[in-house]
Amino acid sequence: MIRWGADVARVAGEVASSNPAATEVASQLDVALVRGGSLTAASGGRKQLRVNGVPRRAAALGAVMRAVVFGPEDMLLVAGSPALRRTTLDELAAAIRPGYAAALATYSRALAQRNRLLRAIREEDAERDELRYWDKPLVEAGGEIVAERLAVLAHLAEPLAQAHAEIAPEEAGAALGLRYETNAPALPGESPRDALARRLAETAEKEVWNGATLVGPHRDDVLFELAGRDLATFASRGQQRTAILALKLAELDLLSAHNGRPPLLLLDDVFSELDPERRGHLVRRIGALPQAFVTTTALGDLDPSLIAIATTWEVRPAADGAQLIGPSQPATRPAARR
């Protein structure tokens, strides 16, 4: 976040790889947020990324450093917009499934063109036969997206249930799961691609009337379920937070298995709304990781057992930006940052 009255926020550091096959042992990473230009609500400015002094696109960051992040905004994952859950699943799929990002880009382009054509048909400025040109790439890419999403969810199932059982052992008998809800369900023996093609044909008239594509992975959803019940409708805030943290830990396990090394775990405001027992279980899980960063505005809000094993840094306002003070409490395994 850019400080009030400033034009730039910048963070830089060295990313070291423990992978012996890595082409570089360490990389210099520099990320800046610049006020003005293409502003985004999330960051307050446009991002500028440099790796070893060379400007890079944000998409290239994954090759340098993988990270799993939990922040206050993630609390919307359970009961918020389906778009948030789709994005979370898409980002994970793109990280572990070759070709997924390309299929997603192809689908997005075909969807935009098809929607434009549907509006033109509604206004009688185009012919319906023209839809076939965009139906093919939409169906091919859309079918691949659904198949890959289902594959990722299948890989997530075991680590998700295990992580939830570790954080909330009192609910060990109620398995946490993710259920994919599609508007183009496949019939017996039907592929996701064929199911999407069939549904597009069934909704053709309605789509022309609405001027938009009404079926496809861009309208699918992922539901959090505990013992088969939708968490969005019955769970407390603490239960929802526990489920989201379990998902983040499951992502960590999945990425670790895929890459051969664990990504960084970044946690912001992680302990609020958790009862003491669940806090303790989460601390034990965090403490077992090679490295994790935990941020808080008040050190007293953190679990004492976490502080005991952490290297603690403090960020204070300064005339020229921010001052980093520490480490004030070195430990054998760094796990917290203030």
Language-model features: locations:
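Conserved NTPase motor "head" modules and their coupling/switch loops across ABC/AAA+ ATPases, GTPases
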Residues: 7, 18-19, 23, 125-264, ...
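Structural recognition of the conserved hydrophobic beta-strand(s) that form the central parallel beta-sheet
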Residues: 13, 291-297
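Nucleotide-state sensing region of NTPase/ATPase domains
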Residues: 2-84, 88-100, 154-162, 192-205
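Extended, Lys/Glu-rich alpha-helical coiled-coil stalks
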Residues: 92-135, 140, 155, 159
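Hydrophobic positions in the central parallel beta-sheet of the AAA+
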Residues: 68, 263-266, 294
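Walker B catalytic acidic pair
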Residues: 268-270
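Intracellular alpha-helical coupling/juxtamembrane segments of multi-pass membrane proteins
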Residues: 4, 107-110, 149
